[in-house]
Curated annotation (Swiss-Prot):
The keyword Cytoplasm applies. It comes from the Bacteria. It is found in: Cytoplasm. Fourteen ClpP subunits assemble into 2 heptameric rings which stack back to back to give a disk-like structure with a central cavity, resembling the structure of eukaryotic proteasomes. It comes from Bacteroides thetaiotaomicron (strain ATCC 29148 / DSM 2079 / JCM 5827 / CCUG 10774 / NCTC 10582 / VPI-5482 / E50). It holds the Pfam family CLP_protease. This is ATP-dependent Clp protease proteolytic subunit.
Amino acid sequence: MDDFRKYATKHLGMNGMVLDDVIKSQAGYLNPYILEERQLNVTQLDVFSRLMMDRIIFLGTQVDDYTANTLQAQLLYLDSVDPGKDISIYINSPGGSVYAGLGIYDTMQFISSDVATICTGMAASMAAVLLVAGAEGKRSALPHSRVMIHQPMGGAQGQASDIEITAREIQKLKKELYTIIADHSHTDFDKVWADSDRDYWMTAQEAKEYGMIDEVLIKK
């Protein structure tokens, strides 16, 4: 830690007192924080917030209402501060709520900035829909990533009429999701329907051939 302090103060010109306070507060922990000294002050950010300053967003959890609200807010904010400049979403997610995911999808289509999507591990279910929904020519995956599409799942209980209502809604969602995948991947709707009847797994290369992505990233 002494070597780090010497390097930071002598070679980077960072303020020693401020640096000591930060080191003391982080003692015993290894948190993903970035420490930057600017002309007037020192700013500490978690690594994800720092990356967002470079217009990089992460979807690394299950898609739920909280995740969707956060991603939509990030997309809207970045589009407002620099309209039309690309935004990148790195995806490693098993999917989740269809309704929450469709909120993210609609926001991606609504903003003026192109949204590049990159699969870094797995894009399954609703996450696969978001992957393919990126700007055409700007969708990619790392070599050992996996992409999976399937039909939406749901359950119902209660009176028969309530079960029928839920079943009709699931069928509507099914058609919506398959239409989104077919339109963005330029794959025949009937093929998407048939393939999604059960879990349909694809390697990165297979996802490219299917039209889910445009490129398999080998090296930056």
